[in-house]
Amino acid sequence: MVKFILVRHGEGMHNLAARTEGNKAYADPVNRDAHLTTTGIAQAKEAGITIKRQWPKATALWCSPLTRCIQTAMNIMDSVEVPANAIYLHDNLLERQRRTNVCNYRAEVKDIRNAWPQFNTDFVPDVSAHWQGEEQGHVVKLRMTMLLEHLKRVYAGAVDPVIIVCHQEALYEVLGVELNNAEYIVAEL
């Protein structure tokens, strides 16, 4: 069994906008690849501090390549020690893809590499997943499950947990639980 700490990203600009604008906030170009709000940064920092109390070290960190998740991961890593060669981005951790939700359109790989050189982007294809259009829940569950099954094999026997930072719907599909911003669940899989 591998211990996973599954974290939803902190509050993003699109989450804040959705409180006043509703679902149209997700399609607003100003929220493309939404960044964390000031509140979201504080939430991510607090999650890192809380995680560190029980697990000061992690075996690895895997993260969605969307900016809000990377920012959440960076703030968690301010508290939790993660080996520099074990910090990864993976498209399987993206939020459920919907053609109109530009908040879930990630940056190009070259831009991600320039902005976040500490992350291994070998598992992020040049072409983003949003071109596929509407993604059904069972497809999200399948891609998340495939990655988790792979990580269970890779990290079998690990002493410290593996941290995964991603999105509400992606986590819901595998956990059956909706997490608030920067909430996390510890699961042995």
Predicted regions located by residue number:
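Short glycine/proline- and acidic residue-enriched helix-loop micro-motifs
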Residues: V30, N114-Q136
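Conserved AMP-binding/adenylate-forming core of the ANL superfamily
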Residues: L36-I41, E134-K141
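Acidic, low-complexity terminal tails and accessory targeting/binding regions
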Residues: M1-F4, L16-A17, G22, A47, ...
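Active-site-proximal alpha-helix that buttresses catalytic centers in soluble enzyme cores
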Residues: V2-N85, R98, F119, A182-I185
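A short, structured active-site edge motif that brings together acidic residues
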Residues: P65, P83-C103, V124-W131
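Beta-strand elements within well-structured catalytic alpha/beta cores of enzymes
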Residues: K3-V7, W62, D160-A170
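A short, acidic, amphipathic alpha-helical segment used as a generic capping/interface helix at domain edges
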Residues: V140-A156
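Short active-site segment of divalent metal-dependent hydrolases/proteases
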Residues: G12, A170-L171
